[in-house]
Each structure stands twice: as C-alpha cells, then as structure tokens.
From Swiss-Prot:
WD repeat boundaries on the chain: 106-147, 148-187, 191-230, 233-272, 275-334, 337-376, 379-411
Taxonomic placement: Eukaryota, Metazoa, Ecdysozoa, Arthropoda, Hexapoda
Disulfide bridge partners, by residue number: none
Source organism of the structure: Drosophila virilis
InterPro entries, per database record: Dynein_regulator_LIS1, G-protein_beta_WD-40_rep, LIS1_N, LisH, PAC1-like_LisH-like_dom, WD40/YVTN_repeat-like_dom_sf, WD40_repeat_CS, WD40_repeat_dom_sf
Record text about domains: Dimerization mediated by the LisH domain may be required to activate dynein.
Name listed for the protein in its UniProt record: Lissencephaly-1 homolog
Gene Ontology MF terms: dynein complex binding
Coiled-coil stretches noted in the UniProt entry, renumbered to this chain: 56-83
A Gene Ontology cellular-component term: neuronal cell body
Record GO biological process: border follicle cell migration; centrosome localization; centrosome separation; chorion-containing eggshell pattern formation; clathrin-dependent endocytosis involved in vitellogenesis; dendrite morphogenesis; establishment of mitotic spindle orientation; germarium-derived cystoblast division
Family membership noted in the UniProt record: Belongs to the WD repeat LIS1/nudF family.
Gene name in the database record: Lis-1
Keyword Cell division: yes
Compartment(s) where it occurs, according to its Swiss-Prot or TrEMBL record: Cytoplasm, Cytoskeleton; Cytoplasm, Cytoskeleton, Microtubule organizing center, Centrosome
Alphabetized UniProt keyword annotations: Cell cycle, Cell division, Coiled coil, Cytoplasm, Cytoskeleton, Microtubule, Mitosis, Repeat, Transport, WD repeat
Length: 411
C-alpha cells in the first residue's frame, strides 16, 4: 500500500534529506537532489538532524510495538488456557513473564552468576571477564565495576545485611568487598589448590564457605581471613555450596553426581544424596512456605507420611531437577522438561513455584504442587547460567553465556 504524503510533509522530508546529505559530505548528491527537488540553497536550522531523529524514533516505536505484541500474546494465551489473569493473581502467584524489562550489556565474557542485594534495589553480576558489575535492577542503570580478580569470577554472595560481598575465582582466591562505602576489596584469602567455584556466607556473617575443584570445602573466618575448617568427602570437583537459612547445615554438589549435606559446626557429612546420573550443577534450599506444596506433590498429607524437611532442590547435567527431604535423605520428586544441563535454581518466596535456568536457553517456572512446568521463557541467545528470585520485590534476574543480564518482571 502506497503512503501518500501531504505537500508540507514532502517539503519537510526533502529538507531533511538535503540536511542529511550535506551533513555527511555527499556534496554531489546534495547538489543533484536540490536541483531535482527545487530546494533553496540553505536549509532551515529546524531541519538539522531531523532524518536521524525520525529514524531512531521509528526504531524505538517498533521495539515498543513488539513488546506490546508479546504482552498481548501472553494475555491471550492465559485467557485461552484459563490461567488466572493479572487482576486475579495474588503476589504469591506472580511469576516472571516475557518480555524482559531490561537486557543489560557491559560484560565482555560469559555471565557466571547473578544475585540480588538483600536490602537495596541493586543486583550483582559476575563474569568470566574477571569483573563484578553492580546494577540498579529497578532502572536498569549500571552503577560500577569491582576489579581485583585475575581470572573468571565464578560466584558471588552477600552477607545477610548486604554489607559485605564475597567472590571467588578461577585465580584460586576468595575476596571480600566492602559494599557500604568504599566498594574496595578488604580481604583476599588463599588456600585452595584449584579453581574456586562457589562461595556462601553462614547466616550470622562471621564465616564464609568456599567450594573448589580441588574437591574440598573450606570455612573462613571473616574477621581474620583464616581458614578454620576443611571438609573432605567429595570425589570430584565441588560445584556449589549453599547454607541453610538456620545456619546449622549446608549443602554441596559435585561432578561426582552427589549432593552432600554437612554439619556446619563439625566436619561431619550428615547425609549423601544419590540419584542424579551426571554432574550436579546447582542446589537451592526451599523456603518454609514451600513445605505444603512439596508434601502434596510427594503424595503425603499431614496425618500420614508427612515430610518435615528441610527440603533441597538440585539441578543436574542429566537435565532433571530433584527435590529432596534432607532429614531422611530421600528424593521426593523429579521434574523433567529441560533439554540440556540445568544450571540455576531459585524458589519463589511464596513457596508455590521453582524457577530454573538451563543450557537449553530457557527459564522454566515449575508448579511444585502439580509437578509440572507451567511456563517456559525463551530467555537468552545462548546458555542460561544463573538465576535469582528477589525475596521482597516482583523481579527475577538471569545471566547467560551471551554476556547479557536480563531483568524479568513478575506479574
């Protein structure tokens, strides 16, 4: 369909084209165009840069239209499937939905971990480019970079108050950063013999745990930087360490296909969980709010066969997610659906859902009670490596090998 311009619109377009040709040094083309379009020698100042402005405006509008179309498709799908619409959903039912609110760029290599600050409207990303970046997740603004590691930063973790940030790296070190004022590295701890793959604070904040490719887990005193305990038992690379909210136990997962749960105050392994058929990449402790959904999914009621927990989720290269009752060392349910390695897990604060990130480039939202994938987000152009769910605000963040960090709004 041919678009018809008014006489005034044609004159403005011709003036804008003439300005563009003149501004970019196309003198011969400008002379020919002026002659054919019957334009005066000098264009008015108001036409300066007009063509570029209109062009960028069209691109912005196209992007907005695509976002609105994605939201409309999403709403139509929910109506057809009979899912609760936004007005009918409670905050406990809000889940991440496309399109992403922000796609943040700046890292020069794969993203290895993304986490929210426990109090402020900030998030942190770690990357194989050896840097840590801080972002405002509500505005999408880049805040600053933390530099000090000399190799890939593998994991980051905040203490409960968000005053200290711990990081670990393939450079064999663990670093503590002041997150209140200076944003400087205040301690560097050495002791592992290989790549340090994961870090986590004990809830009281006085100790940090680290997991390594050297097959050990170490406990470090924050005040002194000294290693006070070394836990051994895994037969291969220890991929991740995560501490239970009460602080008395912590879990680790490994290339040896197992998950181990340890007593924090001793070096004893409380239980070893075996069922995965490949490397276990990630683990996440379930909040208390998830107990009801997990028990129902496991076929237990409050009178008979009720599982007390605590409950732990694990994701593996065998493409499955498993939910465990740690107190008895039993796998209660298995979630199937990903087409590649499962790399990240995070529970919905309301306890009804679990979100997962995978090398199949998707984020999946799992309805725990019904043991099914209720939503798939085609999140990134490459492997999804990490995910986090904010405990108080309706946001999810994800990181990828495509070097982007994405912020997803829950609704």
């Amino acid at each position: 369909m041919k678009m018809v311009l008014s006489q005034r619109q044609r004159e403005e377009l011709n003036q804008a084209i003439a300005d563009y040709l003149g501004s970019n040094g196309y003198a011969d083309s400008l002379e020919a165009f002026r002659k054919e379009a019957d334009l005066s020698t000098e264009a008015e100042k108001k036409f300066g840069g007009l063509l570029e402005k209109k062009w960028t405006s069209v691109i912005r509008l196209q992007k907005k239209v695509m976002e609105l179309e994605a939201k409309l498709t999403e709403a139509e799908k929910e109506v057809i499937e009979g899912a609760p619409t936004k007005n009918k959903r409670t905050p406990g039912e809000w889940i991440p939905r496309p399109p992403e609110k922000y796609s943040l760029t700046g890292h020069r290599a794969s993203i290895t971990r993304v986490i929210f600050h426990p109090i402020f409207g900030l998030m942190v990303s770690a990357s194989e480019d050896a840097t840590i970046k801080i972002w405002d997740f509500e505005t999408g603004e880049y805040e600053r970079s933390l530099k000090g590691h000399t190799d890939s930063v593998q994991d980051v973790a905040f203490d409960a108050q968000g005053k200290l940030l711990a990081s670990c790296s393939a450079d064999l070190s663990i670093k503590l950063w002041d997150f209140q004022q200076s944003y400087e590295c205040v301690k560097t701890m050495h002791g592992h013999d290989h790549n340090v793959s994961s870090v986590a604070f004990v809830p009281a904040g006085d100790y940090v745990l680290s997991a390594s490719r050297d097959r050990t887990i170490k406990m470090w005193e924050v005040a002194t930087g000294y290693c006070v305990k070394t836990y051994t038992g895994h037969r291969e690379w220890v991929r991740m360490v995560r501490v239970h909210i009460e602080g008395s136990i912590f879990a680790t997962c490994s290339n040896d296909h197992t998950i181990r749960v340890w007593l924090t105050n001793s070096k004893d392994c409380k239980v070893e969980l075996r069922d995965h058929e490949h490397t276990v990449e990630c683990i996440a402790w379930a909040p208390e709010a998830a107990a009801s959904a997990i028990n129902e999914a496991a076929g237990a009621d409050n009178k008979k066969g009720h599982h007390q927990g605590p409950f732990l989720a694990s994701g593996s290269r065998d493409k499955t997610i498993r939910i465990w009752d740690v107190s008895v060392g039993q796998c209660l349910l298995t979630l199937n659906g990903h087409d590649n390695w499962v790399r990240g897990l995070a529970f919905h604060p309301g306890g009804k859902y679990l979100v997962s990130a995978s090398d199949d480039k998707t984020i999946r939202v799992w309805d725990l009670r019904n043991k099914r994938c209720m939503k798939t987000l085609y999140a990134h152009q490459h492997f999804c490596t990490s995910i986090d769910f904010h405990k108080a605000h309706p946001y999810v963040i994800s990181g990828s090998v495509d070097q982007t960090v994405k912020v997803w709004e829950c609704r």
